[in-house]
């Protein structure tokens, strides 16, 4: 049995030999193991750390100069008299730090929220499937951002990075130089600043902002990392600096691999533009092409990138009973679809993801069945599944879309013949004027879905259909007692059929669709304002409005409301029993 006293070479040799390899409980630092052949790794509770223990030094705070608030910044704060410091050589600023088993964030301006920049990019987005921008951005537009006059005065930018928000994704890049109001990046961002009408940004790794307990600053010139400790933390507090991108990795195609019973923590992915879903970031478990893989009973926490990522074709990957939480990016990311043998993620608890990269998605995968998971506290979408002929069922999703927009509890594009049933989504409302924060979102080129017996509670926008169609929505319950409700069918030549659904809102209900793009049969509506509006759309624009016509098969009902803890939902003759949503007990 492997134990923490074994050398790295001894552990790697045991894994290289294949077969069953058991680890004794304990903490294994500098964990970075290559997998080359069929192997069954049994953790027995072992904690694998992809980094090294920090030897803290208590130092006087060198950043005590008074920094007044600028627009969008926090008010002045009293600085700590001392900080914890360690050596941290390296040209790139560290983004990850693990203290007491949790990720810590870098010092940030503003302390929360975002600043406004002055860049504009008034070019129409045509849709991903139609090639993106109507005009391709120039190199200069992808490399620069214009800030407000004086916004960066008095700020040390030697080791600074900047997050540029792009509605449904973000770019985190190094600041190369500043000339007047123009910030130049070290690498191009994903979309031009100001695109999609979004003009927000924030700065990271600013010493003048090191005024919040639990944050850190990495001075790349001096090779020092400074940490502002939380109450109760001192130079004896256990902390780790990451050394590796991955803890387990396979560079070549791998098959018949099983990993169970480990805690994995402390990784630092490469500094790249992460793109949609942060898919460019590596995972604590990093695979290429993989088949017959089982990952179960894992606790993946405090890693800087994804929990699990596969970049190649995946056959029969089974992810079950994993707890993936408090991480920089998403829990699961697979990039390549496989229509031959389906994979599955089931009975997992996923939460507090996207801590470093807001565009990260809880579960983002191709051709995966997604069953009995609990996903919450995500910066962007909870689920984003692509492919064909799979099932999304009995998942419990809440507190999602906390930062970005144009996403959903469940969001899919270019998918076919999918069944989504018996899922429960709670609490997605507009934020800062943005309404595209949706419960169930079928996006470009999705076809032939059956969406049945799902519930969305306190969701302003329970259902969005965009450039897709041939879907059946059957016997779902959508409730927003907090205000108005929207659902729609936009920019499509196909149809959506709504049969036996319940829509209940504490305000008006608006159905946006192109003429005759939806059919309605035996649906029940309640609007507290008494208004159920049909906005007639063409090419994404409203060209007329009328009241949605009720008939013998579509009719008004009394208000519908449920407590958050409710799991059996009854409206008239329709009952949806969701007592078994989320992870099951073994």
Features from the language model and the residues they span:
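Beta-strand repeat scaffolds of extracellular/surface proteins
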Residues: 18, 24-27, 33-38, 43-46, ...
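Right-handed parallel beta-helix
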Residues: 255-266, 291-302, 315-328, 339-354, ...
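Extracellular polysaccharide-degrading/modifying enzymes targeting complex plant/algal/animal polysaccharides
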Residues: 3-294, 299-301, 538-586
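Beta-propeller domains
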Residues: 189-196, 204-205, 231-254, 268, ...
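Predominantly extracellular beta-rich ligand-binding scaffolds that present long acidic/polar faces
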Residues: 30-40, 448-572
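Extracellular beta-strand solenoid repeats
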Residues: 22, 34, 42, 49, ...
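Short glycine/acidic-rich loop motifs that flank beta-strands on beta-rich extracellular proteins
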Residues: 32, 268-274, 304-310, 326-334, ...
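Aromatic- and glycine-enriched glycan-recognition loops and surfaces
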Residues: 248-250, 276-291, 301-302, 306-315, ...
């Amino acid at each position: 049995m492997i134990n923490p006293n074994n050398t790295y070479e001894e552990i790697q040799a045991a894994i290289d030999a294949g077969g069953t390899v058991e680890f004794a409980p304990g903490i294994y630092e500098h964990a970075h193991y290559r997998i080359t052949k069929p192997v069954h790794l049994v953790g027995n509770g072992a904690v694998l750390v992809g980094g090294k223990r920090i030897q803290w030094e208590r130092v006087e705070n060198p950043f005590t100069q008074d920094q007044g608030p600028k627009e969008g910044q926090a008010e002045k704060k009293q600085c700590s008299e001392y900080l914890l410091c360690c050596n941290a050589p390296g040209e790139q600023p560290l983004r990850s730090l693990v203290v007491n088993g949790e990720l810590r964030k870098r010092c940030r301006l503003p302390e929360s929220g975002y600043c406004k920049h002055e860049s504009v990019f008034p070019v129409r987005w045509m849709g991903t499937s139609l090639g993106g921008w109507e005009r391709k951005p120039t190199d200069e537009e992808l490399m620069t951002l214009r800030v407000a006059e004086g916004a960066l005065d008095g700020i040390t930018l030697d080791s600074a990075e900047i997050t540029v928000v792009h509605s449904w994704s973000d770019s985190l890049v190094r600041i190369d130089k500043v000339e007047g109001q123009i910030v130049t990046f070290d690498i191009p961002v994903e979309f031009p600043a100001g695109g999609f009408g979004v003009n927000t940004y924030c700065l990271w790794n600013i010493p003048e902002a090191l005024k919040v307990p639990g944050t850190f600053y990495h001075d790349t010139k001096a090779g020092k990392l400074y940490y502002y400790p939380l109450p109760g933390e001192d130079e004896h507090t256990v902390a780790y600096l990451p050394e590796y991108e991955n803890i387990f990795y396979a560079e070549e195609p791998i098959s018949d691999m099983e990993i169970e019973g480990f805690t994995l923590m402390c990784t630092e992915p490469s500094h790249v533009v992460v793109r949609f879903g942060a898919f460019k970031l590596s995972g604590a478990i990093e695979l290429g092409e993989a088949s017959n893989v089982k990952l179960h009973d894992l606790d993946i926490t405090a890693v800087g990138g994804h929990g699990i990522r596969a970049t190649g074709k995946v056959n029969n990957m089974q992810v079950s009973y994993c707890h993936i939480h408090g991480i920089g990016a998403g829990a699961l990311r697979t990039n390549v679809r496989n229509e031959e043998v389906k994979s599955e993620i089931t009975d997992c608890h996923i939460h507090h993801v996207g801590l470093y990269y807001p565009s990260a998605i809880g579960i983002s995968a191709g051709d995966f069945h997604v069953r009995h998971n609990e996903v919450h506290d995500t910066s962007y979408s909870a689920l984003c599944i692509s492919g064909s002929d799979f099932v999304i069922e009995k998942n419990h999703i809440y507190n999602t879309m906390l930062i970005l927009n144009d996403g959903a509890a469940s969001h899919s594009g270019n998918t076919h013949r999918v069944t989504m049933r018996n899922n429960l989504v709670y609490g997605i409302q507009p934020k800062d004027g943005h309404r595209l924060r949706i419960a169930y979102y079928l996006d470009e080129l999705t076809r032939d879905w059956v969406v049945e017996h799902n519930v969305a509670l306190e969701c302003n926008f329970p259902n969005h259909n965009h450039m897709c169609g041939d879907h059946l929505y059957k016997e779902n319950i959508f409730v927003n007692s907090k205000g108005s409700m929207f659902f729609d069918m936009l920019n499509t030549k196909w149809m959506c059929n709504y049969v036996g659904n319940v829509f209940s809102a504490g305000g008006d209900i608006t159905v946006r669709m192109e003429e005759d793009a939806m059919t309605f049969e035996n649906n029940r509506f309640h609007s507290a304002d008494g208004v159920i509006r049909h906005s007639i759309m063409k090419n994404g624009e409203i060209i007329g409005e009328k009241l949605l016509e009720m008939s013998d098969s579509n009719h008004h009902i009394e208000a519908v409301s449920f407590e958050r803890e409710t799991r059996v939902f009854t409206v008239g003759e329709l009952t949806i029993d969701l007592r078994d949503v989320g992870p099951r007990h073994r």
